[in-house]
Amino acid sequence: AQSFLRL
């Protein structure tokens, strides 16, 4: 998973 998905 990309870090931008970790909101």
UniProtKB/Swiss-Prot annotation:
Purpose: FMRFamides and FMRFamide-like peptides are neuropeptides.
Record's subcellular location:
Secreted
Q: Which family does it belong to?
A: Belongs to the FARP (FMRF amide related peptide) family.
What is any one of the record's Gene Ontology cellular component terms?
extracellular region
Organism domain of life: Eukaryota
- Protein's name in the database: Extended FMRFamide-1
> What's any GO biological process attached to this entry?
neuropeptide signaling pathway
**What are the transmembrane regions?**
none
Leucine amide found at? 7
Q: Keywords, A to Z?
A: Amidation, Neuropeptide, Secreted
